[in-house]
Amino acid sequence: MFNKKSNDALLAGIRQGKTLTHNEMLSLIVGLSIPSILAQVTNVLMFYIDAAMVGKLGATASASIGLVESATWLFGGLCSAVSLGFSVQVAHFIGANDFVKARQVMRHALVETLAFSLLVTLCASLIAFRLPGWLRGGDDIAHDASLYFLIYALSVPFLQLGILSSNMLKSAGNMQIPSIMSVLMCVLDVCFNYLFIYVAGLGVPGAALGTVLSIAVVASVEAWFALFRSSILALRLDKERFVWMWSYVRNAVKISAPIAAQYVLMSGAQIVSTYIVAPLGNFAIAANTFAITAESLCYMPGYGIGDAATTLVGQSMGAGQYGLCRSFAKLTVGMGMAVMALMGVVMYVFAPEMIGLMTPVEEIRDLGTQVLRIEAFAEPMFAAAIVGNSVCVGAGDTLKPSLMNLASMWGVRLTLAAVLAHWYGLQGVWTAMAIELTFRGTLFLIRLKWGAWLKAEGGVEKNNADGGRQALL
């Protein structure tokens, strides 16, 4: 189940058109999910470390990061969206056994994503010292919040390279290297944070520097594995001269544009949520930030299973095995809901300890515990939304799922949060979140059951000019 050779053999069987048994599908899902789950959990631990180290500096330092943290998520979201446009194509080509085109797509991705990340860095740097004011942050936290945001923004090119390399390796079925790199990033983050926050005495900017340096080191190593060590994607395997193909870029835009728009508007919604929370005071801002970090430990398994779903659905679709696509969709969504239901129970029971790890301030701990227990009830349906969306991405179906996410976030969560915050404070904001996640999960279950997410079944061309499977349209 956890043997890489066994996973590779099963993936090769998909590409060759073989029929997998139910046990083989489960084995492959678990085998690909476990490393990805570990990677996701490690990423959360890194945020825990940042929060815990900064939390010891007091509520003001925690609030300064919490004020702009939702804005920094936009960087990762945009970088992920742009890289997915190319990595989904790579998964489809690998599924069709066309490794040459898979490497061609990756070359295009390197150029396009570098240009994009530099543009994002420039734009973010220009607004860094205005953002805290826009978010209604107090004067006592504005300066540190601006510095944290600016330093993090400068890491975007490395962040983009790391996300792209990770997604490419996952598209090829290699979940182990991204997982190991996530562990390495966590270790480096601890070391760099200790050095800059405590030894150098830099406080909040030191936390940003520690994170940025760990991102840069890990991105460089991960890119080396993707570009030079992968048995499928290593650039040295190409014998022909590289030729620019605009069709790959156009396909990437078709896949990425809805996801990028979704990330922008979803991050905008998170920023609006911060805007709603900010007037509730520094304790509420800090409790909100810590609760989000604590909850992420519970939903990261869903994202890990979602990574496996994207890879398996993508390669199955590239191989023309559309029945297998649906089987993987059902199994991954069911597994995600079961795992996150269990994590919801854990979160409810251990909420005080989870918040307590990050702050010694009693008011923040009490408030954070209350909102975590509200959210625990929504975890299974949150899993349906996470894994369901990943299934659709693997199939190249991104427009309607993006619209579903946006309608749910803006039409349900923010509307309810604005109303409930007035009457119930932070607890009202998180009640709105729990209701919205349940609604969104329901939408994705309906989409997977009755929607036309598997486009190839609807009569789209199944053979390309070379006689192989049509992987992209």
Describe every region a protein language model picked out:
Residues 41-63, 130-139, 195-202, 264-297, ...:
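Helix-terminus/linker motif at the lipid-water interface of multi-pass membrane proteins
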Residues 48-52, 164-168, 187-195, 223, ...:
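Alpha-helical transmembrane segments of multipass membrane proteins
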Residues 20-52, 56-57, 73-85, 89, ...:
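N-terminal transmembrane alpha-helices
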Residues 62-122, 159-178, 274, 287-351, ...:
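Small-residue-rich hydrophobic transmembrane alpha-helices
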Residues 31-50, 151, 162, 214-218, ...:
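Transmembrane helical elements of multi-pass membrane transporters/channels
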Residues 36, 40, 51-52, 69, ...:
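Transmembrane alpha-helix boundary and packing residues in multipass membrane permease domains
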